[in-house]
């Protein structure tokens, strides 16, 4: 992957780091206050982090659109995306998610698996594999993996502080009533 240019911004779910290449937005990380995210640290160690010379205009547009999203003024991101770090299956599934599950909507892992089969590459994957792809999504929020839920609850989330962030995002988008408690009984 081409070296990334990084920008950061504050958000209601904590600090975010956005990485861009000349081809598009390639990474979005939830950051610990004052530090790098677990994924960012691991990928920088693998030679995928750093500061490159990607378009400052693209980085600025990504930060602006994320700020608009959190201000309730944007429901869909209109940014070029750099999929070069994704496998064919990841690209297919994440593209289907990006194109078919809108703001305020959810889909189950099984629903997304069925939609991916119907996509242009016709990738057939079990729901569990869809969950793994959601967990490795390089562009959370922009490619809205938080909108993919289990058939019997919220499922997991690897961004930020985990399931609390997913719950907050779904409530923010109106897909989950603020009073609904999805925690397992006895938790």
Functional labels for PLM-detected ranges:
Residues 1-121, 172-187:
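Basic nucleic-acid-binding alpha-helical/helix-turn surface characteristic of O6-alkylguanine DNA
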Residues 89-93, 126, 165:
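N-terminal positioning helix adjacent to the helix-turn-helix/winged-helix DNA-binding module
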Residues 117-132:
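Short, positively charged loop/turn segments that connect secondary-structure elements
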Residues 122, 156-162:
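Flexible, gly/pro- and Lys/Arg-enriched active-site loops
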Residues 133-136, 140-143:
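Major-groove DNA-recognition helix of helix-turn-helix-type DNA-binding domains
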Residues 142-158:
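Charged low-complexity interaction tracts in eukaryotic proteins
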Residues 160-177:
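A short, Lys/Arg-enriched interface patch at domain edges and termini
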């Amino acid at each position: 992957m081409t070296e990334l240019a990084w920008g950061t911004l504050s958000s209601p779910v904590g600090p975010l780091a956005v990485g861009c290449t000349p081809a598009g937005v390639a990474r979005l990380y939830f950051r610990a206050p004052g530090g790098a995210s677990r994924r960012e640290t691991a990928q920088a160690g693998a030679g995928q982090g750093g500061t490159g010379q990607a378009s400052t205009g693209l980085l600025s547009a990504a930060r602006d659109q994320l700020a608009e999203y959190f201000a309730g003024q944007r429901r869909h991101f209109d940014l070029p995306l750099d999929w070069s770090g994704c496998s064919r299956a990841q690209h297919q599934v994440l593209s289907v998610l990006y194109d078919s599950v809108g703001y305020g909507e959810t889909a189950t892992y099984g629903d997304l698996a069925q939609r991916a089969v119907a996509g242009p590459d016709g990738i057939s994957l079990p729901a569990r594999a869809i969950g793994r792809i959601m967990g490795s999504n390089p562009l959370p929020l922009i490619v809205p993996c938080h909108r993919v839920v289990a058939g019997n609850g919220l499922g997991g989330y690897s961004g930020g502080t985990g399931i609390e962030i997913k719950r907050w995002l779904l409530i923010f988008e109106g897909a989950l009533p603020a009073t609904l408690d999805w925690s397992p009984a006895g938790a």
